Each structure stands twice: as structure tokens, then as C-alpha cells.
Amino acid sequence: MNKTLQFYNYEQCYAHYTKRIMSIRQAKIHDEVIVAKPVLLLALIDGIEGGEFTGNRFVLNEWLEKRYLTLMKQYTRNSQFPNPADISNPFWHLQGDGFWHLIHKTAVAEGSTPTKKWLKENVTYGHFDDDLWVLLQSKVWRQKLRDYIVEHKLTDDGWLGKIAAEGLGAIAAFLLAA
């Protein structure tokens, strides 16, 4: 779908969700940031673009798994880890970032990340906030958001800027303590 609503504030929605995307919590193992959540977002956006997902219901299916693995291989080619994170990790944990939600068939699993098998058996689908879904219906805004994720979450330049900001924050804290 490439519909644009005439009286919808796309700029405001885009600004809100880019801020939320920058706040995505990502694991860091041996100084390497795990990119599974941003990669899952790209796979979902690609599914919308390609017509695989026509409603705000994303089922953990074979197409999504294959697209996710293809993108993981692309964005983790210099990784110290030989195998990319299983799709169950970001599919489950992205719900903690506030704009991705899972609809369960049964009670929610407690404790650690459920397996892919458990997710397929117990989660009906995942979905975005309604406003994000509306934004993603516009081809222009969908591409802008995809480009933003790649630039800020999946490239070295994005991480170098974040590392520099963290370093400046540490220096400022040190100077204030002195």
C-alpha cells in the first residue's frame, strides 16, 4: 500500500519514531553491538514494501526468517560471532522498546527469551503502533525510515558518532567530579 493521508503529520510521526528507534536497547557482547533489532525492523519494512505484509500483523513465517537472515549476514559480515542471532530474540525483545507489540494465543512465557518454536505456537502475530503503521504505508516515509535505520543503527559512522558522544559524556562526568 502506498497511500498518503492528507491530514496526517508525517514529519511529526517520523521524528517521534526515529527518536524511539535511536533509543532501542541493544545487547553488547565483547564490545560488539548486536544489530538484531534494527535488522528485524528492516526485514519488516521490506515485507511491507514487497507486499508480504498488507496489514499491521506480522507473523513469524518462513519469508520473514529468510529476509532477516539475509540482512543479518549483510550487516554482520565483520562480526566476531560466526552465527547471527536467531530471529526469536529480536521478535520477542523488540516489544520492550515500546512500539512493537505481540498478540499471544496463550499466557506469556516468563524468564528467558522463548524459542522460535514457542513463538510460532503461542504468538498470533506482532504489530506496530498504529501511528508507525500509518507512516509505513507511505513509500516515501517507509524509505526514509529504512534509510535512517541503516545510517544510524547499522553503519560504522552511526556507531562512531554514538561512541564519540559517550566518550564526551564520560569526559564531562570526569571533569565535573574533579
Language-model features, listed with the residues they occupy:
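Intrinsically disordered, charged low-complexity linkers and terminal tails
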Residues: M1-A178
